[in-house]
């Protein structure tokens, strides 16, 4: 059966089903003509496109077609939500949003080791093609991050919820694993940590929050994001607000993987809601970025339900300064686009 025919058959199956179906149910009904990995990829794409709703986690995950438009995420209009797009012609708005998407996606995935260049990223996202000689994994990461940005944009006009965070995680985690110890779209179930070498050449092991404490700690992060008023975020303090949220999520490390990309996405929510462009950490600053994160986390120690997410806010100053130094690339893109807009206005277009 051709791929397009398979996909159509599965969507029809979900629409006609009397209730939610598990991955095993779907595979059985199509006589296992598509692999579990392929099915997960298609289902994730449909979920991001508001065609399918996912419930549960791990082996108990089920899928159901969205038949009621009220269940779907409403269409997103960037021109209505982002003040940094104001006064731009529609075509220039699209150009700027695509430039930000490409830069944000390239930078965030490159910080995690992705080998695709900015040009490669643009080519993949604009043309939908592959770059010869580059790993499929890298292509999937780029497409997944771009999809996550769309999910974020669609939800920017409502309070952040666990469901949105889990949807973002499913978008960025493009390696589909049937492993109960590596849940996708759910909090981690095993303890995690990382071995680092600081700028002083001293080796350390950072222990992230235990799975037991993740729900309460992430609820604190959610509350902080939702409590941030759009009137409280300005160009002058945007990096400080971004740094606090980013550090909190990175220090909790709530997922088995994908924590950095999720932190960099969620930390931009207050900025975007306030009409500011996202803060993008350049890949060239990767070492300083990791060292600054690690220095704070080693100093604070492992987070618990009693410590809270930010037990010593004063120690965030170095990371705040680092983030402020990174808040330039998207502003530069804006300036170039507005130069074009002013040029058009001067010519009477």
Predicted features and spans:
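FIC/Doc superfamily catalytic core
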Residues: 1-349
């Amino acid at each position: 059966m051709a791929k397009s025919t398979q996909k159509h058959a599965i969507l029809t199956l979900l629409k006609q089903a009397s209730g939610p179906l598990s991955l095993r149910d779907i595979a059985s009904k199509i006589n296992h003509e598509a692999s579990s990995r392929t099915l997960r990829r298609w289902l994730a794409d449909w979920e991001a496109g508001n065609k399918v709703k996912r419930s549960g986690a791990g082996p108990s995950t089920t899928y159901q077609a969205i038949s009621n438009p009220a269940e779907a995420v409403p269409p997103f209009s960037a021109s209505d939500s982002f003040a940094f797009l104001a006064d731009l012609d529609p075509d220039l708005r699209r150009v700027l949003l695509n430039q930000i998407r490409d830069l944000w996606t390239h930078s965030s995935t490159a910080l995690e080791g992705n080998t695709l260049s900015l040009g490669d990223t643009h080519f993949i996202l604009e043309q939908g093609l592959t770059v010869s000689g580059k790993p499929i994994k890298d292509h999937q990461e780029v497409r997944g991050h771009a999809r996550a940005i769309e999910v974020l944009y669609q939800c920017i006009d409502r309070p952040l919820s666990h469901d949105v965070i889990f949807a973002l995680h499913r978008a960025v985690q493009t390696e589909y694993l049937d492993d109960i110890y590596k849940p996708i779209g759910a909090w981690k179930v095993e303890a995690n940590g990382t071995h680092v070498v600081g700028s002083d050449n001293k080796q350390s092991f950072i222990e992230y929050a235990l799975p037991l404490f993740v729900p309460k700690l992430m609820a604190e992060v959610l509350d902080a994001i939702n409590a941030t008023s759009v009137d409280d975020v300005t160009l002058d303090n945007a990096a400080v607000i971004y740094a606090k949220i980013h550090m909190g999520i990175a220090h909790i490390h709530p997922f088995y993987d994908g924590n950095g990309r999720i932190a960099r996405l969620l930390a931009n929510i207050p900025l975007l809601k306030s009409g500011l462009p996202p803060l993008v950490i350049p890949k060239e600053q990767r070492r300083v970025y990791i060292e600054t994160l690690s220095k704070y986390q080693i100093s604070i120690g492992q987070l618990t339900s009693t410590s809270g997410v930010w037990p010593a806010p004063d120690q965030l100053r170095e990371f705040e300064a680092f983030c402020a130094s990174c808040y330039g690339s998207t502003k530069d893109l804006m300036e170039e686009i507005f130069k074009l807009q002013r040029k058009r206005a001067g010519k009477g277009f």
